[in-house]
Amino acid sequence: MTSVQNSPRLQQPQEQQQQQQQLSLKIKQLKLKRINELNNKLRKELSRERITASNACLTIINYTSNTKDYTLPELWGYPVAGSNHFIEGLKNAQKNSQMSNSNSVCCTLM
């Protein structure tokens, strides 16, 4: 009888040990999941196109030196009377979109 009485007591530590192992596995799975998510996030960030600060500055300088801004008449002069460069830019953009047959463009940025 003592062996029968001892068997439930032996089962409890075994069950507790199994529960501890299951809990340990769940924790390890969660850690692995978090590491994989972070790894994927870092891969996406690494695949993003990057330019150096000097190239970005050169692009800005090139744009500002080649694009006329009539809000600075001391630098660029005044626009020709009767001309509207906003409408001209819109017409050019529409012509370009018709030539390329691209209907995916919804807006024109100036």
From Swiss-Prot:
InterPro entries listed in its UniProt record: G-protein_gamma-like_dom, GGL_sf, Ste18_fungal
Sites of S-farnesyl cysteine lipidation: 107
Keywords, comma-separated and alphabetical: Lipoprotein, Membrane, Methylation, Palmitate, Pheromone response, Prenylation, Transducer
Modified residues (Cysteine methyl ester): 107
Membrane topology, record value: Lipid-anchor
Listed GO MF terms: G-protein beta-subunit binding
One of the record's GO cellular component terms: heterotrimeric G-protein complex
Coiled coil: none
Positions of S-palmitoyl cysteine lipidation: 106
Propeptide residue interval(s): 108-110
GO biological process: G protein-coupled receptor signaling pathway; pheromone-dependent signal transduction involved in conjugation with cellular fusion; regulation of pheromone-dependent signal transduction involved in conjugation with cellular fusion
Localization terms from the record: Membrane
Main location: membrane
Outcome reported for the amino acid change (mutating residue 107 to X): Loss of function
Other noteworthy facts: Present with 5550 molecules/cell in log phase SD medium.
Subunit structure: G proteins are composed of 3 units, alpha, beta and gamma. The beta-gamma subunit complex (STE4-STE18 complex) interacts with PLP1 and PLP2.
Function: Implicated in the pheromone A- and alpha-factor response pathway. The beta and gamma chains of the putative yeast mating response pathway G protein play a positive role in initiation of the mating response.
Family to which the UniProt record says this protein belongs: Belongs to the G protein gamma family.
Protein name according to UniProt: Guanine nucleotide-binding protein subunit gamma
Organism classification: Eukaryota, Fungi, Dikarya, Ascomycota, Saccharomycotina
